[in-house]
Amino acid sequence: MVYDASRKMEIEIIVKKISDSGRKIALPDESLDIVKLSGIDVPSQVLVKSSGEAVKKSAEIGFPLVMKIASAEAIHKSEAGGVVLGIQGVQEVEEQYSKITSDFKGEIPDAKISGVLLQKQIPDATHLIVGGLHDEQFGPVVMFGMGGVLVELFK
């Protein structure tokens, strides 16, 4: 996908929604929507809110797939049990949906879970992190680098 300046308004709507909710962190689906609207290809994805919906939508996305917890409290999802890789079939989707939500709640009991992101798994892909902030001296700053469990290693 090529960047189209007319998509700037769509990005601004997502950012305003995040800001209006009082969050400083975008949910996984929101951040990936911003990346996609910026002209960068992302794997097929959908945010689901029940195991039944997860089963139905997983068949549309295809396998293997990844599940990621969607919660503003999930900055490091992997460490909190909020990521499952390599899901191969519908039965596993149902089992893992229950497991990922209960494991995450076990790690962060007061967390509000907005849903679970189902995403097509890309074999041998590199995990990336993208972030942004407004620095008083430099203005808007974008951070881009290796993501996943390596984020803390290089911090």
Spans of features found by a protein language model:
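ATP-dependent carboxylate/acyl-activation modules
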Residues: 1-155
